[in-house]
């Protein structure tokens, strides 16, 4: 009975609200409220009659869910048929297509009204509620602005259930929402193809999806497409289009867009170079959490580029990035990136760059298929980590390791254990299987298996935690030089797990592991030097170690992408990728970008800007200790490439390369400058000294040094002649006193010996000429055999 009364009161409130809203709508037609505003207060609806009625209805109907359900259940048991009629009448104000055809069970699914009035729903501005009622979206609220429809939306909106949909949105907002939902679906389709394919044509198809989503202002798609246009990744390189997208993303507050725009201003691509603007955009990108922007700022503060040099500021940025890189390190170690310097590769074509030729890879594959265990293990490791021209492929790695493990190879067993312990899309994670392989490998004395078994006991993976056994197996692995064992031993001593805390021992094992190239070893050493734990605090050392960790992040894969672009003669794409990596502080990228610009192979940079930008990056690479870059700086100042001719500055760079890196080329150049007196006072003796040093420093320099010394001897003789008075010399010269009274006999003897040597040489040369022999008789031509004579028949 109580429910009946409340429903009747609701009907009265609705009818009064409908009439009041009609009159109010005529006089307040231009009024509107924010469609996404918060819940209204009493003050915000005091001037709206319908709002008052809604609040009145709310006060009458607010009950706890349990109370309403109890009352409804009682009423159902007493008079089910009467309640059906009552409910049907009470909701007859709904302007749905066929309300009378809905059954009672469907009507029971109507949300219990919380009657939360939403600001603006009782006014003339259309609104839209993106949730379903009776399996339909209530577009009646948006189409003709009916007061009863809007009132129903306001009084049946369940805040707790429907807050995820937002509040009331206008038609324009609803259209944007539907567009973004469509764009998100297109973006996800493109990313699915992109992540699940390895073929270029499939990746190009994926970027077509992403371009379509980007055209619908999908932020993540815009970020992907903008960088693809910048680098020419599966799309035609278009710096101007990338710039426009970066500007659009920057307006929306995208950290990736801000970082991209900062890069364009830093490198002067598509815009006038401005280091001040670059610094501003990099800073905003870093504040938004972009790790590349943090790396750029870390390097700039470390090297003092555009900012005051500050080791502590560099430490802050590098440590933040290093924390993310260290957290992403997997048990298998992740992918390996090959760093190849283009200047070294061109200067020394025979130098081993570390890349495997396709023919050699096929040869190893042939051996592996024939059962060569070492080839199987080697290919498994290559595919597990990638690098050296081989793409990372866990399926192939697993197959090769499985073949070798079945043949009894302990190394393959240990790596199978690592793959099972880590888990992937190819190999399901299984502590039991990993433990099985680790034990088999460890029993055979394999350090990888011993280290894996130690990890199992340390963290309780498939076994009970046992620090003593973990320490035992790590020590065995470390004694054999395995970096994982050394790293874990250092961690146990650092944290005092299973052993007494000992920072000196931790430092010892971290240093050993870092010599093997383990990323986490560099990270732990950086933490110790940054905080002064176990060592004297050193900001400079900590920054260098953190920088090393940061440069092994996932973005380092761009190095190989840029190298492949260069090998494919796509110099514009290569130089842009190297330039971005150079901004992040990669020395190899700085030298490679400078080399491409030096060779004038990239047309994306104007001719007048080529040498100045190359000089900039040679300078940055030289400051990080690259010898060739330091010599190039001397060459640029010597010849005036990208700057004025400055022999003194050139001499300084050559001397630095000679003293710090013991470069034979720099020593030779110093000898030449001393010989000519360029940038320094002429000194023949110092010139000879540097020439001799160059010959000792490199065997390749011996031939040019010999020629230079011959020339230097002639120069020295001519200089002596110029300085001496020849006429006075001969008048004062007494040959009898110098060579003795028979000096003329000595001279004649020497001339005779020389003449005899020449005659003997000529005779031997004449005897060595072969005497032509008369041609012998030619052999008779072979007689052609005719057809056999036919025997007469007998």
From Swiss-Prot:
Gene3D superfamilies: Fibronectin, type II, collagen-binding, Tetratricopeptide repeat domain
Membrane-related topology note: Single-pass type I membrane protein
Compositionally biased region (Pro residues): 771-794
Pfam families: fn2, Sel1
PTM comment: N-glycosylated.
Lumenal membrane side: 22-738
Compositional bias (Acidic residues): 23-32
Region (Disordered): 23-46, 73-105, 767-794
Signal sequence bounds: 1-21
Cell compartments where the protein resides: Endoplasmic reticulum membrane
Region (Important for homodimerization and oligomerization): 352-537
SUPFAM superfamilies linked to this entry: HCP-like (SSF81901), Kringle-like (SSF57440)
Fibronectin type-II domain sequence ranges: 122-170
UniProt keyword Endoplasmic reticulum, yes or no: yes
TM spans (from-to): 739-759
Function: Plays a role in the endoplasmic reticulum quality control (ERQC) system also called ER-associated degradation (ERAD) involved in ubiquitin-dependent degradation of misfolded endoplasmic reticulum proteins. Enhances SYVN1 stability. Plays a role in LPL maturation and secretion. Required for normal differentiation of the pancreas epithelium, and for normal exocrine function and survival of pancreatic cells. May play a role in Notch signaling.
Official protein name in the record: Protein sel-1 homolog 1
């Amino acid at each position: 009975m109580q429910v009946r009364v409340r429903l009747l009161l609701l009907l009265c409130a609705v009818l009064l609200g409908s009439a009041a809203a009609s009159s109010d709508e005529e006089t307040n037609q231009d009024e509107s409220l924010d469609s996404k505003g918060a819940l209204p207060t009493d003050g915000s609806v005091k001037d709206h009659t319908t709002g008052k009625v809604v609040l009145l209805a709310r006060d009458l109907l607010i009950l706890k869910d349990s109370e309403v359900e109890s009352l409804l259940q009682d009423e159902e048991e007493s008079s089910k048929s009467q309640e059906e009629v009552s409910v049907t009448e009470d909701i007859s104000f709904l302007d749905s297509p066929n309300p009378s055809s809905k059954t009672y069970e469907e009507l029971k699914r109507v949300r219990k009204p919380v009657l939360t009035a939403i600001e603006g729903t009782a006014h003339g501005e259309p609104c839209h509620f993106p949730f379903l009622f009776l399996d339909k979206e209530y577009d009646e609220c948006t189409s003709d602005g009916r007061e009863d429809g809007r009132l129903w939306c306001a009084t049946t909106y369940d805040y707790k259930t429907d807050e995820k949909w937002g509040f009331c949105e206008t038609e324009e907002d609803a259209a944007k929402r539907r567009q973004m939902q469509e764009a998100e679906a297109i973006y996800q389709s493109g990313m699915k193809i992109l992540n699940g394919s390895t073929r270029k044509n499939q990746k190009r198809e994926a970027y077509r999806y992403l371009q379509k989503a980007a055209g619908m202002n999908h932020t993540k798609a815009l970020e992907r497409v903008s960088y693809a246009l910048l680098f020419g990744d599966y799309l035609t390189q278009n710096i101007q289009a990338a710039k426009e997208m970066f500007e659009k993303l920057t307006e929306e507050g995208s950290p990736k867009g801000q970082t991209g725009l900062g890069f364009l201003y830093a490198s002067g691509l598509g815009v006038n170079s401005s280091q001040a603007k670059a610094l501003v955009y990099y800073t905003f990108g870093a504040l938004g959490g972009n790790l590349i922007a943090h790396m750029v700022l870390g390097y700039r503060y470390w090297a003092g580029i555009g900012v005051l040099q500050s080791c502590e500021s560099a430490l802050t940025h590098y440590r933040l990035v290093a924390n993310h890189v260290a957290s992403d390190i997997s048990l298998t170690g992740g992918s390996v990136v090959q760093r190849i310097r283009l200047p070294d590769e061109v200067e020394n074509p025979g130098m081993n760059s570390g890349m495997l030729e396709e023919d050699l890879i096929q040869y190893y594959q042939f051996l592996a298929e024939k059962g060569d265990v070492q080839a199987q293990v080697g290919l498994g490791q290559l595919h597990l980590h990638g690098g050296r021209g081989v793409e990372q492929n866990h399926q192939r790695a697993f197959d090769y390791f499985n073949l070798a493990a079945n043949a009894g190879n302990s190394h393959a067993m240990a790596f199978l254990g690592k793959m099972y312990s880590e888990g992937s899309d190819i190999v399901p994670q299984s502590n039991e299987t990993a433990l099985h392989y680790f034990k088999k490998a460890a029993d055979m004395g394999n350090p990888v298996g011993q280290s894996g078994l130690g990890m199992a006991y340390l963290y309780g993976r498939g076994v009970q935690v046992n620090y003593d056994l973990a320490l035992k197996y790590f020590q065995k692995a470390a004694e054999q030089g395995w970096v994982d064992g050394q790293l874990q031993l250092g961690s146990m001593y650092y944290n005092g797990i299973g052993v007494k805390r000992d920072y000196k021992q931790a430092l010892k094992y971290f240093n050993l592991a870092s010599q093997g190239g383990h990323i986490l070893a560099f990270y732990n050493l950086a933490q110790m030097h940054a905080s002064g734990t176990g060592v004297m605090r050193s900001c400079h050392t900590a920054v260098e170690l953190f920088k090393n960790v940061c440069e092994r992040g996932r973005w380092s894969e761009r190095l190989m992408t840029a190298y492949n672009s260069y090998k494919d003669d796509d110099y514009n794409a290569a130089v842009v990728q190297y330039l971005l990596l150079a901004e992040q502080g990669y020395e190899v990228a700085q030298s490679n970008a400078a080399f491409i610009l030096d060779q004038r192979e990239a047309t994306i940079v104007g001719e007048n800007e080529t040498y100045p930008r190359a000089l900039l990056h040679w300078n940055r690479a030289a400051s990080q200790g690259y010898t060739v870059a330091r010599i190039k700086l001397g060459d640029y100042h010597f010849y005036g490439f990208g700057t004025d001719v400055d022999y003194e500055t050139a001499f300084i760079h050559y001397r630095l390369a000679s003293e710090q890196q013991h470069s034979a080329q720099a020593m030779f150049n110093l000898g030449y400058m001393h010989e000519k007196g360029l940038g320094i006072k002429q000194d023949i003796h110092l010139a000879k000294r540097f020439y001799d040093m160059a010959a000792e420093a490199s065997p390749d320099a011996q031939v040019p040094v010999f020629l230079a010394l011959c020339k230097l001897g002639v120069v020295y003789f001519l200089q002596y002649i110029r300085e001496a008075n020849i006429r006075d010399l001969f008048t004062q010269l007494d040959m009898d006193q110098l060579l003795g009274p028979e000096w003329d006999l000595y001279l004649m003897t020497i001339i005779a010996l020389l003449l005899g040597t020449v005659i003997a040489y000529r005779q031997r040369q004449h005897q060595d000429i072969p005497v032509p022999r008369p041609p012998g008789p030619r052999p008779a031509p072979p007689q052609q055999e005719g057809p056999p004579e036919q025997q007469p028949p007998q």
